[in-house]
């Protein structure tokens, strides 16, 4: 435990500014007790870093207050500042730092399997090349979240203290994407599927090298589709990944299952029941999508009007209503009403809307269970990517819908019947086009807020989400309540997160150079990602 603490908790110098005066190399010489080795075994480093990644990407801060609200799955019940794009600087600084620590740990795992003085020991825990490949894959997954949140970020010079790089430059996002696809290609090609990746410590795939290979190539497809509006080679990247082997069913899903053991709870659960807070509920826009309802306030239609999604009762519980009839209290649980998105928490109607929405603390859905399985990337996600790759093909689209509904209803312990699944697939497949694929992908990506937010920015869908300036609700007095962000996003669902303020002092010159490349030369929320070419809130750019 001491060793894991060293890598995952103690501050690490990342080459982006000095966070501490003690290096990891010096820490390694502070304890020579053979019964308490300072060197972390590679299997423990993998398990510890996997958990740290999941704990911070799928949590009630970066995960819930940012990505899940940016994607309008969740909204806050108490303080709605983050819903309205006012981000706490301490949180922004903290997650930027934590995510880079995770990258460092994967670099360290690679070193443990390449350094001749350490590789022999690491081989006890799995094939060296397979361990390296798994570390590369996890590093790319984490890096993709970093760059898709902030844009241009340190990469090639990050974590290079031993090479006397104390302040890392910010790489262009275009170059980072090219590097990530290259890393995944190399990872896939070095995997020996006949040998274990890890004999223990791999929470995601239990050491199954064949599944790591499929994940590497499926993730290549995801990154390639991100580039569909800006890189004419995106189809080539996918074709090459398909040749190397991708997910074939839900059995290949990259997921992280938490435990019911004390400190191993899912962070969504901990944020509610360990911390004793009741902070979130489902949004009205997402609830309307699931219920097949049009947005009458903003005159937006629904492509599957009247079709209730079978995942509705998985993703949320209803609001429990109690009514007294005579001397008997009758409870009804059929009220599925989402909370209006982006209303100021100080508005005198806010408590009314909150009390109409589901109370997840009292009646928790599956994502608030102790051992919830968080989705990293799924077979359904891949099928929607392949549908788009094939010109929005119906076969892959339908397979994606089937896989998603089957996965979520099975995870919830109530698998959908074949007849009901067939009926739903038929109802949502009358017209398969860019909107249908994007909307079903959005529904599937619930709880994967980072990827859903990417897709919203890349495609401009779903149209049903509330844009700045649109009507969120109308009060009983007829007052119109609009979604009015606290930060300027030029009328768009938030395109990026500002660079953390710590970077301006710890890595000032490189920070300033990065800011100068943003729109208007300021550290803002409205500068777009390299792959985001939308020209307006309802623009749906064509693929190259």
Please place each PLM-identified region on the residue numbering.
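Conserved, well-structured interaction surfaces
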Residues: 74-154, 160-199, 369-372
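Bacterial Sec-dependent N-terminal signal peptides
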Residues: 1-32
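Hydrophobic-face positions in mid-chain alpha helices that act as interaction patches
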Residues: 234-386, 390-444, 448-450, 459
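Internal, well-ordered domain-core segments that constitute the primary functional module
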Residues: 178-249
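Long, intrinsically disordered, low-complexity segments
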Residues: 23, 266-306, 312, 423-544
């Amino acid at each position: 435990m001491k060793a894991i603490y060293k890598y995952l908790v103690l501050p690490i110098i990342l080459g982006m500014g000095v966070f501490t005066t003690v290096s990891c190399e010096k820490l390694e010489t502070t304890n020579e007790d053979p019964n308490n080795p300072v060197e972390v075994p590679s299997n423990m480093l993998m398990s510890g870093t996997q958990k740290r990644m999941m704990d911070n990407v799928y949590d009630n801060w970066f995960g819930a207050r940012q990505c899940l609200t940016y994607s309008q799955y969740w909204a806050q019940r108490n303080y709605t500042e983050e819903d309205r794009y006012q981000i706490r600087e301490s949180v922004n600084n903290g997650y930027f730092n934590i995510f880079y620590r995770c990258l460092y740990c994967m670099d360290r795992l690679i070193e443990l399997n390449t350094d001749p003085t350490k590789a022999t020991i690491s081989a006890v825990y799995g094939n060296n090349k397979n361990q390296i490949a798994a570390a590369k894959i996890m590093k790319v997954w984490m890096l993709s979240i970093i760059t898709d949140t902030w844009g241009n970020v340190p990469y090639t010079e990050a974590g290079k203290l031993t090479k006397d790089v104390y302040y890392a430059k910010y790489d262009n996002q275009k170059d980072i994407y090219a590097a990530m696809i290259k890393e995944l290609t190399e990872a896939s090609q070095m995997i020996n599927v006949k040998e274990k990746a890890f004999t223990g410590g791999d929470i995601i795939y239990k050491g199954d090298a064949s599944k790591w290979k499929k994940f590497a190539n499926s993730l290549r497809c995801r990154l390639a589709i991100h580039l569909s509006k800006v890189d004419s080679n995106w189809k080539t990247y996918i074709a090459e990944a398909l040749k190397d082997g991708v997910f074939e069913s839900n059995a290949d899903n990259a997921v992280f299952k938490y435990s019911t053991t004390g400190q191993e709870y899912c962070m969504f659960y901990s944020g509610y029941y360990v911390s004793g807070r009741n902070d979130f509920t489902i949004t009205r826009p997402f609830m309307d999508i699931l219920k097949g309802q049009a947005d009458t306030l903003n005159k937006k239609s629904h492509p599957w009007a009247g079709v209730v999604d079978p995942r509705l009762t998985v993703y949320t519980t209803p609001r429990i209503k109690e009514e007294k009839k005579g001397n008997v209290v009758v409870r009804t649980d059929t009220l599925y009403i989402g909370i209006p998105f982006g209303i100021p928490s100080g508005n005198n109607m806010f408590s009314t809307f909150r009390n109409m929405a589901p109370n997840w603390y009292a009646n928790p859905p599956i994502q608030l269970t102790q051992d919830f399985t968080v989705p990293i990337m799924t077979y359904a996600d891949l099928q929607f990517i392949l549908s788009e790759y094939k010109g929005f093909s119906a076969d892959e689209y339908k397979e994606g819908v089937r896989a998603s509904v089957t996965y979520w209803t099975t995870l919830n312990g109530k698998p959908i019947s074949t007849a009901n699944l067939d009926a739903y697939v038929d109802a949502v497949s009358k017209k398969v086009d860019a909107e249908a694929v994007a909307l079903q992908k959005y529904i599937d990506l619930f709880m994967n807020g980072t990827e859903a937010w990417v897709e919203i920015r890349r495609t401009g869908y779903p149209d049903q989400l509330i844009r700045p300036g649109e009507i969120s609700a109308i009060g009983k007095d007829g007052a119109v309540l609009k979604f009015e962000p606290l930060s300027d996003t030029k009328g768009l669902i938030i395109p990026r997160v500002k660079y953390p303020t710590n970077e301006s002092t710890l890595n000032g010159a490189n920070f300033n150079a990065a800011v100068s490349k943003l729109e208007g030369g300021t550290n803002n929320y409205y500068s777009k990602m390299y792959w985001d070419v939308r020209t307006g809130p309802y623009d749906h750019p064509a693929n190259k």
